[in-house]
Amino acid sequence: MAEKSYKYRIYPNKKQQELIRKTFGCTRYVYNYYLDKRKKLYETDKTTYTYVKCAKDLTQLKKEFEWLKEVDSVGLQTSLKDLDVAYKNFFSGSAGYPKFKSRKNRHQSYRTSFTNNNITFMDRHIKLPKLGLVKVRDKQVPQGRILNATISQEPDGRFYCSLCCTDVSFVQLSKTNQFVGIDLGLVDFAIFSDGIKIENPRFFEKSEKKLAKLQRDLSRKSIGSNRWDKARVKVAKLQKHISN
């Protein structure tokens, strides 16, 4: 048994998109708010708030800012857990001091945990807290038990949902005790020791040239204009294609 993640492209309606973006903002606000409080305390006497302390304080913060109640409460709690992990990594010496999250980051996301069957994969839909049923095209049903879901938006505007599952069974392949050597090159993509050759389709070179042209077009547009935004999305989509 092991853990496995399943990433789906989701197609939220306009109301769901608005709520997703609002959740991005609220989880980012909570993270930055308590990072600021912990930062000031650390600068004063080299101590910090615990996760439990922040979680209790969040209840009062939601009374002060009613709009925090409009989004998934588990998502807000998860942002506190992420901050707590960031501090533990800092104090253990494995990472630098936690940084504030920026709304200008073109990749936005939040994570929510499975509880009381609040995350379910149904026929071409994923049920998510506060969002309800969100459309997906992929028919692949996640195996095992769902632990959490990460909802994200890429720079090209597309939305995704990644389901992290545990207790996933894998088929153990039988050993063949056969070996093959692979030589990767520029002229031929790969040459196997048994004589098989795979030609280099040069997709990367073609995509790189196309990307350079799109980036030149983007640089000529007025920043913030509709044409600039359309050109930016084209660049982001091609960058996503190249990275895949």
Set out the residue ranges of the language-model regions.
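Nucleic-acid substrate recognition interfaces
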Residues: 1-244
